[in-house]
Amino acid sequence: MPVDPVACEGCGFLWAEVEPDDAPGRLAAAVAAFIEQLEVAGDAGLLRPSPERWSIVEYTGHLRDALLSMRERIIVASVTELPTGTPIYREERIELGFARLDTPAEVAVELEVATGLLLKTMLTLPDGFHDRPLIYSSNFSSPTTIAWVIAQAVHEAEHHLGDVAENGRLRRG
């Protein structure tokens, strides 16, 4: 994932079209729809539709972890000069079994909490802080901004909402 792409190849998301004032509403709406997909799936949300595709619960846990990580990146970039974020090791978390105890009900609550914390951070960000620079993670060399991280949070939620909706379609046949 480049730090400043024009559009996501997978979902068509355009980072430049996310205004910081619109981001909280878009994030909240995507997460609400995400949780609805999780609730509709029930225990079937624990099942992978194929070995190479995550389950709905795994996607939900990934989004939870990504939002928590982005919140920390925003806070650190607000208080230090050009910090470098830590990768979240998304694939490794799954491969090492860190999601195996997640249940649909618990991961839904955890996603709601993570979203609420990030939304509070977005809504209380001091004026002028959207342009503060940071290195998104050690996997990237170019600086980006807090505004981009906020847009990326929206992208994560909207993109993976598409993934869980597809899982639902695959489950229903």
Where on the chain are the PLM-derived regions?
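Hydrophobic packing residues in well-ordered alpha-helices of helical domains and bundles
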Residues: 24-27, 56, 104-111, 146, ...
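Acidic/His metal-coordination segments adjacent to aromatic residues that form catalytic metal sites
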Residues: 15-19, 92-107, 139-147
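Acidic/histidine-rich alpha-helical segments that form the ligand environment
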Residues: 26-31, 35-40, 93-133
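Terminal targeting/low-complexity segments that flank the catalytic cores of oxidoreductases
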Residues: 1-29
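Short, contiguous alpha-helical
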Residues: 1-5, 43-94, 130-173
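Short acidic/polar alpha-helix capping motifs at helix-coil junctions
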Residues: 7-12, 22-23, 37-39, 82, ...
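Hydrophobic alpha-helical segments and helix-packing faces
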Residues: 20, 27, 52-56, 63, ...
